[in-house]
Curated annotation (Swiss-Prot):
UniProt name for this protein: GMP synthase [glutamine-hydrolyzing]
UniProt GO molecular function: ATP binding; GMP synthase activity
UniProt lineage: Bacteria, Thermotogati, Thermotogota, Thermotogae, Petrotogales
Subunit structure of this chain's protein: Homodimer.
Domain Glutamine amidotransferase type-1 residue range list: 3-190
Gene name of the encoded protein: guaA
UniProt cross-references to Pfam families, sorted A to Z: GATase, GMP_synt_C, NAD_synthase
Binding site for ATP: S218, G219, G220, V221, D222, S223, S224
Domain GMPS ATP-PPase: 191-382
Record keywords, A-Z: ATP-binding, Glutamine amidotransferase, GMP biosynthesis, Ligase, Nucleotide-binding, Purine biosynthesis
Record's function text: Catalyzes the synthesis of GMP from XMP.
Record EC number: 6.3.5.2
InterPro entries: Class_I_gatase-like, GATASE, GMP_synth_C, GMP_synth_GATase, GMP_synthase, GMPS_ATP_PPase_dom, NAD/GMP_synthase, Rossmann-like_a/b/a_fold
Highest rank taxon of the organism: Bacteria
Length: 507
């Protein structure tokens, strides 16, 4: 199968870049910069960005094998700086960093910029800059600060850009990638997610064989798709385990049990572990520690259930790639943002072998795979819900009282969005309980209650997100209902932070 090889230098956007390539119908493979490289069936190479400076002692390098492969190369951000230094150009720090939206001007013709306006906005994230291009290379664009934003040597098939075309904030970013992949590399695009499904089912069969597996089923999109995909591969050798850790939304246990038995016919066991999780989290306020504890307890519960199944050796998890990236597992040079319960919280002495069939996919791709597998819309288009659940939506220590309050608040918010037709318009919405009490008025008396924060974001893959512009009249209705129906809440606020710089979840 013809493919584009993406070499990862530690960018948070590396797998997003791979996804953009797949969106163009071309298979992409991501490898680390120091992995052994096979160029079989490779038709083009992309060097990702990364957090390093090319002048650091241990800075990731590029091999002569790649530069001499006579394949089209696209260097992005760090990849551009690396090529410049390697081929005799100059990279410097001049005290002018460029972060976020930046305007660039095309200064010379380039196949990379075919049918693209001469001036457009891009997404930058760099301190180092190329101040001199290698011999026989030409500058093709400059930023409004007169900084080199792209250069190339068409005869050598080497193209370099300082900005990130894979991020949606870059105008015409997909067109630039398309120009490279189709126009320069000559790939037409015939790979589909159907290919992924077929290959993954075969891979799961080959991995698990006639052994048994259990799945960490939550009722969310990711674990649901992982369950059906695995069930297609090994049939009744899959047992679904639904753990009620006490941090689920209102009525969620009953809804999940009903949905999976009605729609999917899975062999489903519900484990009530509420007291176990709460006791482990008593006195814990640090969000990283919460995630680690919850991740470990999940595994222990699954191990105990697996021991009841003779021959059970595998644990299926619905980890997707945004989870992996945020846990700093995507590249050796990636900076850690926060751990994910499916990734960063796994105990080292786990007795089960982990299988993560969706770990290469983003949320929208997971939904597309679910559609291919025939899952109902009400499962596929539920808003994302974190594995630790409401535990990371209560700031500070968790107890029964706070959980009850948050469940009521969240239920009001979500139901109001559904009633007003806004639930399907936003990517994710939820409530957060802030354990700070503020003054309010109840009747003729002063009162003190908690603050509830509402969070709603628009996104596609979860790597970047904008806060949702929910109409004020709907927010007004939600706020009024919460303060009237949940007596412990005296104040409601709406989170208008985008990702980046914020993350979607508060913890």
């Amino acid at each position: 199968m013809e493919k584009i090889l993406v070499i990862d230098y530690g960018s948070q956007y590396t797998q997003l870049l791979a996804k953009r390539i797949r969106d163009l119908g071309v298979f992409s493979e991501v490898i680390q910069y120091d992995d052994n490289i096979s160029l079989s069936n490779v038709k083009g190479i992309i060097l990702s960005g990364g957090p390093d400076s090319v002048y650091n002692i241990d800075a990731p390098d590029i091999s002569d094998e790649i530069l001499n492969a006579e394949l089209p190369i696209l260097g992005i951000c760090y990849g551009m700086q690396l090529i410049a230094k390697k081929l005799g150009g100059k990279v410097e720090q001049r005290g002018i960093a460029e972060y976020g939206k930046t305007k660039i001007n095309i200064t010379d013709q380039s196949l990379l910029f075919k049918k693209i306006p001469s001036t457009f906005n891009v997404w930058m994230s760099h301190k180092d800059m190329v101040t001199k291009v290698p011999e026989k290379f030409k500058i093709t664009s400059l930023t409004s600060n007169n900084i080199i934003s792209s250069f190339e040597n068409e005869s050598e098939n080497i193209y370099c850009i300082q900005f990130h075309p894979e991020v949606r904030h870059t105008e015409f970013g997909i067109d630039i990638l398309k120009n490279f992949i189709q126009g320069i590399c000559g790939l037409k695009g015939s790979w589909t997610l159907m290919d992924f499904v077929e290959n993954k089912i075969k891979e799961i069969k080959d991995t698990i064989g006639d052994k048994k597996a259990i799945i960490a089923l939550s009722g969310g999109v990711d674990s649901s798709v992982a369950a059906v995909l695995t069930h297609r591969a090994i049939g009744n050798n899959l047992k679904a385990i639904f753990v009620n850790h006490g941090f689920l939304r209102m009525n969620e246990v009953e809804e999940v049990e009903s949905t999976f038995r009605d729609y999917m016919g899975l062999n489903l066991t519900t484990v009530d572990a509420q007291e176990r999780f709460l006791s482990k989290l008593k006195g814990v306020t640090d969000p990283e520690q919460k995630r680690k504890i919850i991740g470990e307890e999940f595994i222990r519960v699954f191990e105990q259930e697996a021991k009841k199944e003779e021959g059970c050796e595998y644990l299926i998890q619905g980890t997707i790639y945004s989870d992996v990236i945020e846990s700093a597992k995507s590249g050796k040079k990636t900076f850690k943002i926060k751990s994910h319960h499916n990734v960063g919280g796994l105990p080292e002495d786990i007795d089960l072998k982990i299988v993560e069939p969706l770990k290469e996919l983003f949320k929208d791709e997971v939904r597309s795979v679910g559609e291919i597998l025939g899952l109902p819309r009400e499962i596929l288009y539920r808003h994302p819900f974190p594995g630790p659940g409401l535990a990371i939506r209560i700031m500070g220590e968790i107890n029964d009282e706070k959980l009850t309050i948050l469940k009521k608040v969240d239920n009001i918010f979500i139901n109001t969005l559904k009633e007003t037709g806004w639930y399907d318009k936003v990517w994710q919405a939820f409530a957060v309980l802030i354990p700070v009490k503020t003054v309010g008025i109840t009747g003729d008396k002063r009162s003190y209650g908690y603050v509830a924060a509402l969070r709603s974001v628009d996104s596609v893959e979860g790597m970047t997100a904008d806060w949702s512009k929910v109409p004020f009249e709907i927010l007004d209705l939600v706020s009024s209902r919460i303060t009237n129906e949940v007596e412990e809440i005296t104040r409601v606020v709406y989170d208008i932070s985008s990702k980046p710089p914020a993350t979607i979840e508060w913890e």
